[in-house]
């Protein structure tokens, strides 16, 4: 199975294919294509290739680099003109892309990108208090606006526990967050996004818990 996966990546991750992807992004009227969700995942892929122990990964990383740098620059430009964060629990969520982008920036020691993300995160989220998490989830969301923001800020602020206590002061009582979302029809491709919400919530909670003291009431 591993050999098949490696062969498949070798087949698809080529200079020619990356050039086609880059051309698609840089064509007229595509400035907002896959922004910011696709940006975050592309940078996450680059990070995985950078940190992978597979002997082929270094070649894949270099092959992807032209597209990676283009997306990196697009993210910086986007953050420079984004007046307000997007908090919806779908592809447009700002905090989700910033969390992935920040991990990439630190992995490759891109201080310029890191600072751009830190500045944006603090501008958007540092003053947030009493987030209305009891209104979650939306009917076809797969990201928790509350938990994804908290995940990002656990990577941003030095005093995360204090920030978190103001952001979600009664988190343990928020039934909507503390219980899995109900998926009533998995044949409906939009409603089935709620399965993804349960997974992404668990991912966020795992990271958030590690950033809080063991005796934290949440």
Question: What are the language-model segments listed below?
Answer:
Residues 108-112, 116-218:
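Long, repeat-rich segments with strong aromatic
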Residues 1-105:
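Extended ligand-binding groove/face enriched in aromatic
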């Amino acid at each position: 199975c591993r050999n098949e996966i490696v062969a498949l990546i070798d087949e698809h991750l080529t200079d020619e294919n990356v050039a086609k992807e880059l051309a698609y992004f840089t064509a007229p009227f595509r400035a907002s294509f896959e922004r910011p969700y696709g940006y975050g995942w592309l940078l996450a892929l680059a990070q995985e290739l950078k940190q992978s122990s597979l002997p082929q990964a270094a070649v894949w990383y270099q092959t992807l680099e032209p597209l990676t740098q283009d997306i990196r620059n697009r993210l910086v430009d986007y953050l420079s003109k984004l007046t307000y964060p997007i908090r919806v629990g779908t592809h447009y969520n700002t905090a989700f892309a910033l969390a992935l982008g920040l991990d990439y920036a630190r992995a490759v020691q891109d201080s310029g990108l890191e600072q751009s993300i830190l500045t944006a995160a603090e501008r958007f989220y540092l003053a947030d208090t009493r987030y209305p998490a009891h209104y979650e989830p939306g009917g076809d969301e797969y990201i928790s606006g509350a938990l994804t923001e908290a995940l990002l800020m656990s990577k941003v602020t030095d005093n995360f526990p204090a920030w978190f206590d103001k952001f979600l002061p009664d988190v343990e009582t928020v039934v909507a967050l503390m219980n899995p979302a109900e998926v009533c029809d998995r044949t409906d491709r939009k409603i089935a996004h709620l399965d993804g919400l349960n997974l992404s919530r668990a991912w966020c909670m795992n990271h958030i818990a590690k950033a809080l003291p063991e005796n934290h009431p949440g």
